[in-house]
């Protein structure tokens, strides 16, 4: 993803004459970095070298018609720089980590057959974890079971599924929060599909694509300065508001029978816009294909303060002229809009914080080491980690590198 309208081009000549001879033809490169850090710009330059194919590692870019809020490359960019795993499902659909891993395995083989190095670029750390650390062999959800469980959840609520989970999988029931809709739903799906609790599946040995002895994996983690990243995040969000994120969400609601519990509607930015639309009682929720009650229930607590405020002003407003009421409504909507923007900024910063935490864990960097790293002097830190303790028969190694800037990552790849 990239900040549109303000591209950060790396200071370099064409990469075509500077490709690193250390990257073998069987290499797989993961470019891991927090949101708004400039991953896409480097990916584009590497693609221009002619040696790479791009594979998106972003759980939001998989959705069609979700463009502004995901900072998705525009149509011209996607035509110039094709990405695998972008625009592959509708916002109504789900896309599991297991499905992602399966797709990536197929795409890696295809890239190598084409004489290209797969460049996996994005910020969804759960996806990277599945690729590098492994995934328990939990079966991919059956569509009919998934639809059945979703209907059950809509009819009786997540509490019914949580109670059922307590009867069939006590371990997962105790581990999961009662409001964790996504994981509870998945656990129930797995049990109904296999008759085996998901906790049993999760105890089985992990399987990771990075264990493949016929491939050389390079995992590059870029962890930029926090103040710099926070500025980039603010710039990105400003652009999203100007490009029409609110209008995009309204359009999605008009087009699809969405619910607030769908993974697509839990994406940062989209979630905050939904809450805003509920707070201002937007007429889009009157669409016949939408369950208005679900949206208002999902944001009941935040909407309550707005309702209480309106009730407190009711007596005063009863004596107002229509013009005064219109002004009051405009002020209320403006306040709700500002709250939406503040919440989206906070949520995006929290997302970046989680991404930093995971990257430090993977790179085996303590908070202190990360803070003391310098941009200008030291070479990027490197560690080579074997996975013999995870898979006794595997002797392959995963090469890990950490950087402060995209320039350092570029230097490694050039």
UniProtKB/Swiss-Prot annotation:
Gene3D superfamilies: 1.10.20.140, P-loop containing nucleotide triphosphate hydrolases. Substrate binds at residues 35-40. SUPFAM superfamilies: P-loop containing nucleoside triphosphate hydrolases (SSF52540). Keywords: ATP-binding, Magnesium, Nucleotide-binding, Transferase, tRNA processing. Its EC number is 2.5.1.75. It holds the Pfam family IPPT. Residues 58-61, 182-186, 266-271 are annotated as: Interaction with substrate tRNA. GO terms for biological process: tRNA modification. ATP binds at residues 33-40. It catalyses: adenosine(37) in tRNA + dimethylallyl diphosphate = N(6)-dimethylallyladenosine(37) in tRNA + diphosphate. The record marks 124, 146 as: Interaction with substrate tRNA. Its cofactor is Mg(2+). Catalyzes the transfer of a dimethylallyl group onto the adenine at position 37 in tRNAs that read codons beginning with uridine, leading to the formation of N6-(dimethylallyl)adenosine (i(6)A). Belongs to the IPP transferase family. This is tRNA dimethylallyltransferase. It comes from Psychrobacter arcticus (strain DSM 17307 / VKM B-2377 / 273-4). The lineage of its organism: Bacteria, Pseudomonadati, Pseudomonadota, Gammaproteobacteria, Moraxellales. The gene is miaA.
